Amino acid sequence: DTLWDEVKRFDYPHKYYVDFSQKLWQILPLGPTGYGDSPYQAFSTFAGNPYLIDLEELIENGWLTEEECENTDWGGSKSYVDYEKMYQGRFPLLRKAYRNSHIAENAEFIAFCEENDWWLSDYALFMAIKDSQGGASFLEWDAPLKLREPEAIRRCRHELSDEICFWQFLQYLFAKQWQALKAYANGKGISI
């Protein structure tokens, strides 16, 4: 289930939250998780977890197909999340959606990146470098990167510019979906 599936339960089948006067939906932190997938150990205070991006919107936008999503191995359990399969299945789909979106020229995306530059630029750079380092902890990176030496950072911003844009794209999607979900829940009288 996605967050949208959960919020739809406000309406169906028995409007649990509304019928039982529930006014608060308590959730775990939504940040992007690393090894161990604990929501309390996120890579960023401000970023959202790409695992929570609803792929339906990407299908509706024509960036993915239903078949691609259905043919992905998400694991066999409806009650247990297989995070390894989630990672292995979700990121190739998200990368494909990114390539198909041609988002770099989208005015709304550009505005989002500019408005959130105070955290998004460093977060996207960090994640791009982390991927380029095989997912290794930053403690294992070469000293110039680990110590954020200006020349090393400039070089990475140039060499990893497309990967940086990918991570910005994920945050753009997450933020859009989260804002819509929150507005929907708030409209039903539910605070998050």
Mark where each language-model region is:
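Acidic/aromatic-lined carbohydrate-recognition and catalytic surfaces
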Residues: D1-I192
